[in-house]
Amino acid sequence: MGLRTAKKRGLGGGGKWKREEGGGTRGRREVRPACFLQSGGRGDPGDVGGPAGNPGCSPHPRAATRPPPLPAHTPAHTPEWCGAASAEAAEPRRAGPHLCIPAPGLTKTPILEKVPRKMAAKTPSSEESGLPKLPVPPLQQTLATYLQCMRHLVSEEQFRKSQAIVQQFGAPGGLGETLQQKLLERQEKTANWVSEYWLNDMYLNNRLALPVNSSPAVIFARQHFPGTDDQLRFAASLISGVLSYKALLDSHSIPTDCAKGQLSGQPLCMKQYYGLFSSYRLPGHTQDTLVAQNSSIMPEPEHVIVACCNQFFVLDVVINFRRLSEGDLFTQLRKIVKMASNEDERLPPIGLLTSDGRSEWAEARTVLVKDSTNRDSLDMIERCICLVCLDAPGGVELSDTHRALQLLHGGGYSKNGANRWYDKSLQFVVGRDGTCGVVCEHSPFDGIVLVQCTEHLLKHVTQSSRKLIRADSVSELPAPRRLRWKCSPEIQGHLASSAEKLQRIVKNLDFIVYKFDNYGKTFIKKQKCSPDAFIQVALQLAFYRLHRRLVPTYESASIRRFQEGRVDNIRSATPEALAFVRAVTDHKAAVPASEKLLLLKDAIRAQTAYTVMAITGMAIDNHLLALRELARAMCKELPEMFMDETYLMSNRFVLSTSQVPTTTEMFCCYGPVVPNGYGACYNPQPETILFCISSFHSCKETSSSKFAKAVEESLIDMRDLCSLLPPTESKPLATKEKATRPSQGHQP
């Protein structure tokens, strides 16, 4: 759902999107301003391997086999598709664990079995489920896969240079083995050996502004509010849903998510859910801090912050020990709207400061907290349950594209861009014109967790007449309180600078929502392959059509099967994908359609294999990140391995992707992670596929509309190739031989 001079992942600590933050929400962001001129300076939303997925079909027996590393293209000799290594990012199943873990010292993958529904129903919450620790992949396996992933993306001369550097790094008794041993020791001592490194690299070290660069948005179906009261009733119902959902979290009553698709039934780590309403991203001069509001000293927050006309109000949701009813919330919201309309009482739009670069916002906050009034106001915001932003009409047509832009950046200072507080993890936007959704600060949780929460809230809103838990009304409701600010000339200067930078971000974003309606995942499943793998190959073909090359690609893969797992990266720009896209474009006439079909199968099979590798903890990105950070701490200089241009290039994710399927009418979107890149978030539905494509106007090489057109052409071409496959042959590849699994590395 989720960026960008030269402090790239290989040199600096900063990064987002998968991953993207991505994410996704997406790939780690090159630290460069979204608008190129902005000073300072992610993210997928949906996550492959998350709590659910497209059921697809049984995987090809080799789909779960760790390629040693990804093999060069060998034409398939069977007409069947590879089975679906599901991207697993839709409605999750709620179930429990059934793990068979090898004895200590063995390096095989844990046997993660499917869990029968009856057994799943009896399982405890994830905290009690005994999830395994994230394994440490074998060093030589990671190094070999890294070279294989990059060989076809760099020149032969550059590859030979990088190969020699990698061989030296991984030599027996060398630095690589020393760092690997340190990592194994870290694994023994921590719940998750990569989580701290990943959080800092993906998000907290990133100095870019949060809007577009890091924070994804979920856009609801357009609402129709004939009057202001209708808008407020919707907001009141949404707040009521938040309180009900938070009560479930507080009592640990939410069943454990379990994976669908590949290795279905495995329980998933639920820790991220408990950061939905208790997290706050505190700006820092060089690194942000993710604050969790779980103090035993401070009382549990019982208020929501409402933003209206760029003003901020405290809405207490518990008064006299009673939770406000939906009717009470509506009454209080009406008071807030009336108070906000009093222009004589309006204060400067302090929320703008949170849209600035993180170092700039940290500097401004240092000035703000010198005054006790400002400290009190900041404290109320930082400890709130969530924000609810009552937006003014955006003044544009209410297409999917324009509504998404309102969520991503608010339209800038002149519209709703200042009616936000980007540091808070969840901001629910309820616009007077029916534009509604949620803006997410991505560091505490991944896209699928946000989707699960949001779908619960929307179901609550639509069924509130039956599900609302009503408390007795409080006869005398005290008026909500306006937060006060004292702004020095220095703060006024920061506000002016923040407003100008936000306008640059708004003008620079090239964004389009495109619905492909020729077919959806139903057709793809009939081909006996994973919808996610199919779409990923289509994205590679689309990019190659426009730019005649492939680039490092990021697709979020959930590793919530393990303790405190977040995401790793599926590197979708495989050698097999390159062979296929060249056959379809460069050699269109020379390669017969039947051979193109075989190449397509190989590309999907390679994508599927890497997906399984990633969701079982065997991908390379997190492993290399941890080795790099250990080297940074141990060595006077960063090893040549992590200064090499191939490594730096491998972490500039020109194509940042994430699958975020939904079961209700909504979709997710985010910005690119590098200045010359694309963000591509997609939502596969039975008969359609919705794409949110983003890029930057300042890059003359990219165009979101052209990319969307190329995606359409690619999906149609792939459908036409599928028509060559007789219906009787449309079945999974043979599954007689026993599936093998990738080496699971060192087990705790």
Swiss-Prot record:
Active-site residues, record numbering mapped to chain: H442 (proton acceptor)
Residue ranges with Basic residues bias: 1-10
Pfam families with a match to the protein in the record: Carn_acyltransf
Annotated residues for binding of CoA: 520-532, 558, 659
Phosphoserine modifications at: S125, S473
PROSITE patterns xrefs: ACYLTRANSF_C_1, ACYLTRANSF_C_2
Single Gene Ontology MF annotation: choline O-acetyltransferase activity
Superkingdom in the source lineage: Eukaryota
Compositionally biased intervals (Basic and acidic residues): 17-32
Composition bias, Low complexity: 54-65, 73-89
Effect after changing L210P: In CMS6; impaired activity
GO cellular component: cytoplasm; cytosol; neuron projection; nucleus; synapse
Sequence segments annotated as region (Disordered): 1-89, 727-748
Illness the protein is tied to: Myasthenic syndrome, congenital, 6, presynaptic: A form of congenital myasthenic syndrome, a group of disorders characterized by failure of neuromuscular transmission, including pre-synaptic, synaptic, and post-synaptic disorders that are not of autoimmune origin. Clinical features are easy fatigability and muscle weakness affecting the axial and limb muscles (with hypotonia in early-onset forms), the ocular muscles (leading to ptosis and ophthalmoplegia), and the facial and bulbar musculature (affecting sucking and swallowing, and leading to dysphonia).
Entry-linked PANTHER family: CARNITINE O-ACYLTRANSFERASE, CHOLINE O-ACETYLTRANSFERASE
Entry similarity comment: Belongs to the carnitine/choline acetyltransferase family.
Protein name: Choline O-acetyltransferase
Species per Swiss-Prot/TrEMBL record: Homo sapiens (Human)
